Structure formats: C-alpha cells, structure tokens
Amino acid sequence: MPIMPITPKPIRRTAFFLSDRTGITVEMLGHSLLSQFENIPLDEITLPYIDSKAKATSAVRTINERYIADEARPLVFSTLVNPEIRLIINSADALHLDCFSIFIAPLEAELGARSSENMGRSHRVSDPTGYWKRINAINYALEHDDGLSQKNWNRADVTLVGASRTGKTPTCLYLALQYGIYAANYPLIPEDFQREELPAQIRNIRSKLFGFTIHPERLHEIRSERKPESVYASLKNCEYEVQSAEKLMRRAGIPYLDATSKSIEELATAVLHEAKLERKIY
C-alpha cells in the first residue's frame, strides 16, 4: 500500500484590526478578506482608538509579543488616518495591510484634492436626520417584532414573514440599524396554516411582505436550543411548519428565500434587493 503524504497542519495566525476610532470599518473589511481563507485558523484582536503615538507604540509591543508567541507573523489590518501613527505601526513585526493608504493616494490623484485626514468620519453623527431615522427604525422593529403590535403595520417598508425562528428578528434589527429601514416581522403559526390565509394584521400589506424559509433539520436544531424535547422543536413539527409556511406564502404570492446557510448581512442584502428598498448606509 502506498504511503500517503501527510498534509501539514495550517499554522494558527493572529489578525489584528487597528483603528483610530471604533474599528467597525476595518473589522468589516478584514473579515471580508479573511473569509477567503477559511482553512486558516485565526485569532482575532481589535485595538480601537489608536489615536496617539503612545497608543501606537503600545499596539506595536502587543503585536510583536504575539509574533513571538505564535512563531508566525501577525496580520495587521488598519484604518489609521495620521501618517505618523501609521509609520509607528509599520515598524511592527507583522504583515501590515494599511487600508487607507492603499486607496487614499489614487483617490487624491483622481479627484485632484487632498484628503481631510479626519478620524472616524464614517461613524460620526454628522447628520442628525440620519441618526434619528435609525433610532426610530430600531424602535419600530422592536415594537413590531413577532407580531407584537396591533397598529401601524402599513408604516413598514418591509414585513418579514415565515415560521418562527427563521432569522426574521435579527434581520429586521440589522436593516434598521444599518439602513434606517422600517422592518416588521410576523410569524406564521399553525392557526394560520389551518385557516390557509394570512393573519388579518398583514393581509392588507401584501405588497410589502417578504418571506423566509429554512431547512427543517436546521430549524429543529435552533428550536431545540430554546425548548428541547418539546413538540414545538420536534423535527416532525418543524417539517410541518416549514412546508405549510411555504405553501401559504406561495398561495399569497409572497416572494421568499431560504435562510438556512445565510448570514444576517446576506439576508438583509437580499431583502433590500428583492424588495427594491433604497440602500443608504448611515
């Protein structure tokens, strides 16, 4: 029998996300890039508010200590505006991916203008109107979660429907937080399946309805975490509810998608696209 070659185990690496403000932007960009290397084990560390030389020097020390511990160069993603702070971070024993300098220079050349070098502009409350739109959208999503409210359903930009525990609530909150979308959600339950018609609260807003479905096996896993050994969580009941919800949505002409293996971000993006909602990040 031939001896099969042993595939070396991937080395565990550390990824740092550095920012002079919240770190949200660099985390999103770094995660998007690293998701292309799913077989590489990673430890992730975010260091926000690196807005002074002293903090930058401390960050370099932390990065170098990790290099010694891992015996592998850390990966450093940064969105640092101050060139002096960037220079300090460049001295670290790491692969430094400076997300700002990569893009700012060609943008300055193309636009014929210097960048402002202001820190944290993308997450600053510079537009009170946009800020309050998000706050009001979040409050609306909470008030209209799981069919709780009995009024103002026609105010929703979109109302998500489907069996319970298919990802409707977190998607609504994400749409509200990121885009200021007024998103409600209404669970389809066995009583609706028996009547074979939509609940009265959402019957007159059919054009704003969008559905989620899910594989019964995955729904069984999710519900079992909350109510193990219950009829509600049983695989048989999950199969019944998923099939019945899909049948009801088809009958009502409601577009729907399979949420089984999609992230909240992917679900929200799909809803924006399919429901033709304005996509504006605040």
UniProtKB/Swiss-Prot annotation:
Q: Which UniProt keywords apply?
A: Kinase, Nucleotide-binding, Serine/threonine-protein kinase, Transferase
**By its UniProt entry, which InterPro entries does this protein fall under?**
Kinase-pyrophosphorylase (IPR005177), PSRP (IPR026530)
Name assigned to this protein: Putative phosphoenolpyruvate synthase regulatory protein
Instruction: Name the reaction it catalyses.
Output: [pyruvate, water dikinase] + ADP = [pyruvate, water dikinase]-phosphate + AMP + H(+); [pyruvate, water dikinase]-phosphate + phosphate + H(+) = [pyruvate, water dikinase] + diphosphate
Q: Which organism is it from?
A: Nitrosospira multiformis (strain ATCC 25196 / NCIMB 11849 / C 71)
GO molecular function annotations of the record? ADP binding; ATP binding; phosphotransferase activity, phosphate group as acceptor; protein serine/threonine kinase activity
One Pfam assignment = Kinase-PPPase
What family is this protein classified in? Belongs to the pyruvate, phosphate/water dikinase regulatory protein family. PSRP subfamily.
What this chain does, per the entry, is described as: Bifunctional serine/threonine kinase and phosphorylase involved in the regulation of the phosphoenolpyruvate synthase (PEPS) by catalyzing its phosphorylation/dephosphorylation.
Say which enzyme class the record assigns: transferase
Where is ADP annotated to bind? Answer: G162, A163, S164, R165, T166, G167, K168, T169
Disulphide bonds in the chain: none
Show the HAMAP family listed in the entry: PSRP
Its Enzyme Commission number(s) read 2.7.11.33, 2.7.4.28
